[in-house]
Amino acid sequence: MESILNNSVITFVAYVGIISIYLFVIPLILFYWMNNRWNVMGKLERLGVYGLVFLFFPGLILFSPFLNLRLRGNNEG
C-alpha cells in the first residue's frame, strides 16, 4: 500500500512540475524574448516565435494583460 501511495505522490509532483513549466516558465521566457526582440526580429525568428506562441498559447493567455508590444516613444512632448 505504501508503494502505491509513494508512486501516486511522485506522479502528482511530476504532473504539477510539467504543468507549471508549460503554463508559467516557458511563457514568461517567451514574453521576455518577444518584448525585447519584437521590433528587430527577422523573418525566420518571427516565424519561430509564432510557432511557439501557438504551442504555448494557454500559458501566454494567462500573462497577456501584462505584455505591451507597442513601439517605444522617444520621450518627447
Swiss-Prot record:
Name where it's found: Cellular thylakoid membrane
Q: Which residues cross the membrane?
A: 12-32, 47-67
Q: Which UniProt keywords apply?
A: Membrane, NAD, NADP, Plastoquinone, Quinone, Thylakoid, Translocase, Transmembrane, Transmembrane helix, Transport
Q: Which HAMAP family does the annotation name?
A: NDH1_NDH1L
**What family name appears in the similarity comment?**
Belongs to the complex I NdhL subunit family.
| Subunit annotation | NDH-1 can be composed of about 15 different subunits; different subcomplexes with different compositions have been identified which probably have different functions.
Know the name of this protein?
NAD(P)H-quinone oxidoreductase subunit L
